[in-house]
Regions:
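Beta-propeller-forming repeat regions
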Residues: 19-310
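Sec-dependent N-terminal signal peptides of Gram-positive bacterial secreted proteins and lipoproteins
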Residues: 2-23
């Protein structure tokens, strides 16, 4: 009887208190706090531009926020790059990327661009032309292996877009030729026409754009990538180690590097002549890694136990 009375009194207290059980609904608990300071001003600019909108978040890479702060004009202070889709009655709208800068103490929209892709695949920052500040590379995805990319440069108060003509499955920004400026390495697999290739794009002053300076064929048996790592080779060259998945739950490793003597990409493990291919095929599940922490990536290889037939 005493226990029942205590339970009844506790229930009555909860019912009468300001923090009622009904106030603890999921929506209230998950509502984010209001932005303050610069973030509030940036949010205001987005709302003025978009009206009703939904943020879009990059799917891969180091930058996964819908609003990314980064210095893209070399003035020593960060600008904002944001992604959203406008909410429309039919639910159909392009992704918008908006560039926001603080001018004379006020955050303002500088430019906005639309893309019909389904997702923002990734965002990268790199000084690709040697002007001393970073360009913005945005990858766009339509849920296939053929991603597209656009490079944006913010200079003289204007944002200039440049769509790259090549699609990619994965990419890396690295100084492959050791000239102090990053190059863009792009590789792709196309299961429809059974093609695979890697290419290196480098800034050209003549065209004021990224141009393809070298291209090499890769293993057409690969259907998708399991791992993609840029790293150092034992000879000091820079390359990309790619673990690719083949049919039958098999995996192989491809290496593509920039050869400074030949001034082109090399793929030493691949040959169009099947008799000259170096086989690194193994059961899927184990990818390349720097096992001994010497700065050089090691490649796994499968071999039968001693006494077993190969």
């Amino acid at each position: 009887m005493r226990t029942k009375l205590i339970c009844a009194l506790l229930a009555l207290c909860l019912f009468c208190s300001g923090c009622s059980v009904m106030d603890l609904d999921t929506q209230n608990l998950m509502s984010p706090p209001k932005a303050t300071g610069d973030k509030a001003d940036i949010q205001r600019v987005i709302e003025e531009s978009a009206g009703s909108y939904t943020f879009k978040y990059p799917q891969k890479g180091d930058y996964r926020s819908a609003v990314i702060m980064h210095d893209i004009n070399g003035d020593g202070t960060d600008e904002a790059v944001a992604f959203y889709k406008s909410n429309t009655p039919d639910g159909v709208s392009d992704i918008t990327v908006i560039f926001i800068d603080q001018i004379s103490g006020e955050w303002q929209r500088i430019a906005a661009f639309q893309n019909s892709a389904a997702e923002v695949e990734r965002v990268c920052f790199s000084d690709l032309n040697g002007d001393g500040w970073d360009s913005v590379l945005i990858g766009w995805s339509n849920y296939s292996s053929a991603n597209q990319a656009t490079v944006f440069r913010y200079e003289n108060g204007e944002v200039k877009p440049s769509d790259l003509e090549y699609s990619y499955t994965d990419l890396a920004l690295e100084d492959f030729d050791r000239d102090g400026t990053d190059e863009l390495f792009m590789s792709s697999v196309n299961t429809a026409d059974k093609s695979a290739a890697a290419r290196l794009l480098k800034y050209s002053e003549a065209s004021d754009s990224l141009v393809n300076v070298s291209e090499v064929e890769m293993n057409q048996e690969v259907t998708q990538y399991a791992s993609f790592q840029a790293g150092e080779l034992e000879n000091g060259y820079r390359g990309v180690y790619i673990d690719g998945v083949k049919s039958g739950n098999q995996m192989t490793t491809e290496l593509v590097y920039w050869d400074p003597e030949e001034q082109k990409l090399q793929a030493p493990f691949y040959s169009s002549d099947s008799s000259n291919k170096i086989s690194l095929t193994r059961p899927a599940g184990v990818t390349c890694m720097d096992i001994n922490e010497d700065g050089v990536i090691e490649i796994p290889a499968a071999r039968p136990f001693e006494g077993n037939a190969a």
